[in-house]
């Protein structure tokens, strides 16, 4: 009898479950995966090289475009590295705002993940539910920075501006009657902080809805339990971080182990899995959303009681106030010089890592004393996770490869850079 050879199948880069431009070359024995070879580079934009020809502040918007689902956390890692080289202190209020927006971004990311992951596996409803909540958080992004996605809100030394006193409201239009308009603007009558508070008061019920649809769903469990199992030892060896590592039972979270900003003052728990499969990673991320609610509530409470500056008083780094620029020529010149020439960063190197929704996002920054980085190295969590795909998918069906890509929460902006 003739020997049957394995055959190869190209999965992506146009496949809707490939999460962007992933090309997987699968070696199959029937429908069982023998080898999965990810081909990357289709979204390579030379971010690290571009940063070498831009001033330190001009590279902040590039960070938003790495993992374009977790925008502000990318910025956070970058500005932390600059602040370490400059040796400047960030005002306490700015630190609380950063932590608040890190957690808003974590929820944004996990909502996108749960919607896309469920949709890939075949559950449509969760996707629509998740985007209902994402819309409110996108509005918060827009209220503080003017942009729904690429915010450029974190700056070396603090944040772009304090939280506004008014939340933008929906305007009357042909598709909305007055009753619908009043309902949509109900939570928008106060400040941005009031709106965020209202959102996180409502949000636990929304998470309960997602869990009602998925957690004990028989089909969901059949598709996730026992798929893509990673032992704690292998998770460490492969460099997995974030929910991928915690899903395997290792309680490693930079917010607890190497706290930055004001995370050491926050009261929250680190959810940890037991079996290291796709289902455990799902449970870890859902619980992370609940912990983000706790952290956000603590930040809101502190921010209400403690007004103050949100930018460092080091004028070599901080731009002048808008009011000053309108009345004072020196302030206008200062602003122009700062945003065209930038500021010089002392010679040295620094590594700053933040607990990104996907794992450890690190920025290694080398300065030669100029106004531009000498070298910028980005440590993207998704890169190590994608490298583990071959091992996780081996012995599973083609349909399970989709589940494994979903559980890794891959976004190609940060992998290809």
Curated annotation (Swiss-Prot):
It is a peripheral membrane protein. It comes from Burkholderia ambifaria (strain ATCC BAA-244 / DSM 16087 / CCUG 44356 / LMG 19182 / AMMD) (Burkholderia cepacia (strain AMMD)). The lineage of its organism: Bacteria, Pseudomonadati, Pseudomonadota, Betaproteobacteria, Burkholderiales. Keywords: Cell inner membrane, Cell membrane, Membrane, NAD, Quinone, Translocase, Transport, Ubiquinone. NDH-1 is composed of 14 different subunits. Subunits NuoB, C, D, E, F, and G constitute the peripheral sector of the complex. One of its GO terms (molecular function) is quinone binding. PANTHER family: NADH DEHYDROGENASE [UBIQUINONE] IRON-SULFUR PROTEIN 2, MITOCHONDRIAL, NADH-UBIQUINONE OXIDOREDUCTASE 49 KDA SUBUNIT. Belongs to the complex I 49 kDa subunit family. The gene is nuoD. This is NADH-quinone oxidoreductase subunit D. Its EC number is 7.1.1.-. One of its GO terms (cellular component) is plasma membrane. It comes from the Bacteria. The keyword DNA-binding does not apply.
